[in-house]
UniProtKB/Swiss-Prot annotation:
It comes from Trichormus variabilis (strain ATCC 29413 / PCC 7937) (Anabaena variabilis). It catalyses: heme b + (2E,6E)-farnesyl diphosphate + H2O = Fe(II)-heme o + diphosphate. This is Protoheme IX farnesyltransferase. Pfam families: UbiA. GO terms for cellular component: plasma membrane.
Length: 318
């Protein structure tokens, strides 16, 4: 982290203050984290999630993610200042000072831990806190600026919300919880490397050793291809041998996975084509959201009743 010579700018209204602090949390990232939490919770609760517990866990997860992203903004303010697309963020533009942002981040973390401890359980709260610590110390401080494997290892932080959701429901972590964690972990490289292919020049400008910058596009798309295949296979392990999800989820996972593989295959053969990389990046977001939605739908008692009714009718016909 390098200090930047940014003059302090004052907000013209209280609304602008709120907007600046809201932007610090990188709110567009958070919904994707929450959907993995939801998918995990519904499977753990066998489709019958306590609405209050769901609300509390989502709120606690949001606060934890917001805290981690705020600290990330503090740490990365130097490189954000050097990139045109990020120069106008609250930290590099001088709208929010380091001390104020740090107090904000700590307050969010404390609120998250307290909320989850009181209304869920200590395991869920501890996992959320560990996610903040891992993201800040391992990814932001250590890996991001020093290793091409930054988002691979750092992807563990983004996968922790799935564990938080499971722990909030059961108070334990089963093999299914760890598999959902692994699915998100394995999905992260194709997702972020596709983005890195799109903005490779920005990363090169500020010296971030993303894989496309160091190894080139051809090597990157090969890694994307391998991780995509492994991710799709991993999603099916929830059906067999773990039996945590059923036929509805299996159909959704196979359909989504087929498209994911096809788009990754196209990028493998067009490593320099940014529109193809963008297409994969955008689809990877939809893929994870719809996959988790499939977990939710499959876990619902109504879904089970409908499947059983169809099976019984087929037996009668045969």
């Amino acid at each position: 982290m390098i200090e930047t010579n940014v003059s302090r700018r004052h907000h013209e209204s209280f609304l602008q203050v709120i907007q600046s602090y809201y932007q610090l949390t990188k709110p567009r990232i958070i919904p994707l984290l929450l959907i993995t939490t939801a998918g995990s919770m519904w499977i753990a609760a066998q489709g019958q999630v306590d609405p209050v517990l769901l609300l509390v866990t989502m709120a606690g997860g949001t606060l934890a993610a917001a805290s981690a992203q705020t600290i990330n903004c503090i740490y990365d303010r130097d490189i954000d200042y050097d990139m045109e697309r990020t120069r106008h963020r609250p930290m590099p533009s001088g709208k929010v000072q380091v001390r104020d942002a740090l107090i904000f981040a700590i307050a969010l973390a404390v609120l998250s831990f307290t909320l989850l401890t009181v209304f869920a359980n200590l395991l869920a709260a501890s996992l959320a806190l560990s996610g903040i610590i891992f993201y800040v110390l391992i990814y932001t401080h250590w890996l991001k600026r020093h290793s091409t494997q930054n988002i691979v290892i750092g992807g563990a932080a983004g996968a922790i919300p799935a564990l938080v959701g499971w722990a909030a429901v059961t108070g334990t972590l089963s093999w299914s919880a760890w598999l959902i964690f692994a699915i998100v972990f394995l999905w992260t490289p194709p997702h972020f490397w596709a983005l890195a292919l799109m903005i490779r020049d920005d990363y090169a400008k500020v010296g971030i050793p993303m894989l496309p910058v160091v190894e080139g596009n051809a090597a990157t798309v090969k890694q994307i291809w391998y991780y995509t295949l492994i991710t799709v296979v991993a999603t099916l392990l929830l059906v067999y041998p773990l039996h945590s999800s059923g036929i509805v989820y299996a159909a959704i996972a196979i359909s989504l996975g087929a498209v994911f593989i096809r788009k990754s295959w196209r990028l493998l053969h067009n490593p320099e084509d940014r529109p193809t990389a963008r297409e994969l990046f955008l689809y990877s977001i939809s893929y994870m959201m719809l996959l988790c939605l499939g977990m939710v739908i499959d876990s619902l008692p109504l879904t089970h009743h409908l499947i059983n009714a169809v099976i019984n009718q087929l037996h009668l016909i045969s």
